[in-house]
């Protein structure tokens, strides 16, 4: 290591207080720490230098010797770390062991808490009639399920994993390079802290396997487009004893040829005869549940008029109430090619009557104008 000035390395003056030295070291240590600069040899060397400077300048006796005699006065420079623990004690004063993956000096056993499986999505198409009455929908999908041979342990004969002998269960390996301690992922257990001695032949040691799942999903009546139904525990299987994820079934309602839906209300269009529109009467239509209902058509109904049928729409979710059905009337015009002789005669008579009525109205209008 080059003999650089310790004060310059920490970017402080020679009269700096111990608090200023600590603050400067913390800033530089964070900047150059190997965990923040993986593979950067220059940063690693810089980290070693600022740590060596701090070890001397934070000790009043070593600092006094350094100020008077230079590096020789500080007992040969950076000699203070006789074990891997010495470096950790200094660095943990600042960061609480926040770097290096968290394995403690006592090599505490790595937590083997299970990992939950992923949630899954399934898109289900149903008819409007299905949404009206509610159904039990059979679905099937392929996902990772718990291996039934090893019961999810990954070991042959359902034998559970054992603690890794290389890292003693921590999942991390610490090596001492002079005064500097480097911590890396254990290459034996790949950071798991445990190993499977004899892997299950069916799942290859993963504890899971790909398989088809067949279940029945309850779709409640009144469900709307885009709504989702959650089935707990039917997602991807977890690992290391972790719980399975959930399955979310998203509902898509197929386009209906007759009814359009707006929440719990239904809308439809019904053609009626011109005479019915003029004289009024009743029409029979079929509702979404297949029942026939009578709809009253008032006299003088115009095209586009909406007739409301109360509580003949879709059911509300988790309720016995229903929305309304709106029937939009389309008044049909007469097709001259399909008229009978009698119908033509009646229309001519109607035309003569209308002309006479118009003539009387015109004469009355002009007589009023003349009087003025």
Swiss-Prot record:
Its cofactor is Zn(2+). CXXCXGXG motif repeats lie at residues 147-154, 164-171, 186-193, 200-207. Disulfide bonds: none annotated. Keywords: Chaperone, Cytoplasm, DNA replication, Metal-binding, Repeat, Stress response, Zinc, Zinc-finger. CDD domains: DnaJ, DnaJ_C, DnaJ_zf. Zn(2+) 1 binds at residues 147, 150, 200, 203. Pfam families: DnaJ, DnaJ_C, DnaJ_CXXCXGXG. The J domain is necessary and sufficient to stimulate DnaK ATPase activity. Zinc center 1 plays an important role in the autonomous, DnaK-independent chaperone activity of DnaJ. Zinc center 2 is essential for interaction with DnaK and for DnaJ activity. Participates actively in the response to hyperosmotic and heat shock by preventing the aggregation of stress-denatured proteins and by disaggregating proteins, also in an autonomous, DnaK-independent fashion. Unfolded proteins bind initially to DnaJ; upon interaction with the DnaJ-bound protein, DnaK hydrolyzes its bound ATP, resulting in the formation of a stable complex. GrpE releases ADP from DnaK; ATP binding to DnaK triggers the release of the substrate protein, thus completing the reaction cycle. Homodimer. This is Chaperone protein DnaJ. It comes from Wolbachia pipientis wMel.
């Amino acid at each position: 290591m080059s003999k650089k000035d310790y004060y310059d390395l920490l970017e402080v003056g020679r009269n700096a207080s111990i608090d200023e030295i600590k603050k400067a070291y913390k800033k530089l240590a964070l900047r150059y720490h190997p965990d923040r600069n993986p593979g950067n040899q220059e940063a690693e060397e810089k980290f070693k230098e600022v740590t060596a400077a701090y070890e001397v300048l934070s000790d009043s006796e070593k600092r006094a010797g350094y100020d008077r005699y230079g590096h020789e006065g500080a007992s040969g420079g950076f000699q203070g770390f006789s074990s891997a623990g010495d470096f950790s004690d200094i660095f943990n004063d600042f960061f609480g062991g926040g770097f290096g993956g968290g394995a403690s000096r006592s090599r505490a056993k790595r937590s083997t808490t299970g990992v939950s499986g992923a949630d899954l999505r399934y898109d289900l198409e149903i008819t409007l009639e299905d949404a009206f009455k509610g159904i039990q929908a059979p679905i099937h999908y392929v996902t990772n399920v718990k291996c039934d041979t090893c019961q999810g342990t990954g070991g042959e004969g359902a034998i559970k994993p054992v603690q890794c002998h290389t890292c003693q269960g921590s999942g991390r390996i610490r090596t001492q390079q002079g005064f500097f301690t480097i911590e890396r992922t254990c290459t034996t257990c790949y950071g798991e802290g445990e190993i499977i001695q004899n892997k299950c032949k069916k799942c290859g040691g993963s504890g899971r396997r790909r398989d088809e799942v067949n279940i029945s999903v309850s779709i409640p009546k009144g469900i709307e487009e885009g709504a989702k139904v959650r089935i707990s525990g039917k997602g991807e299987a977890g690992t290391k004893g972790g719980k399975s994820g959930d399955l979310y079934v998203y509902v898509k309602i197929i386009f209906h040829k007759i009814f359009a839906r707006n929440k719990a209300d239904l809308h439809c269009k019904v053609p009626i005869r011109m005479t019915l529109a003029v004289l009024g009467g009743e029409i029979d239509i079929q509702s979404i549940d297949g029942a026939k209902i009578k709809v009253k058509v008032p006299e003088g109904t115009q095209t586009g008029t909406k007739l409301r049928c109360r509580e003949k729409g879709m059911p509300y979710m988790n309720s016995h109430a229903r929305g309304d059905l709106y029937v939009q009337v389309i008044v049909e015009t007469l097709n001259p090619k399909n008229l009978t002789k009698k119908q033509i005669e009646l229309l001519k008579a109607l035309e003569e009557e209308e002309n006479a009525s118009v003539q009387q109205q015109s004469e009355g209008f002009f007589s009023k104008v003349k009087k003025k």
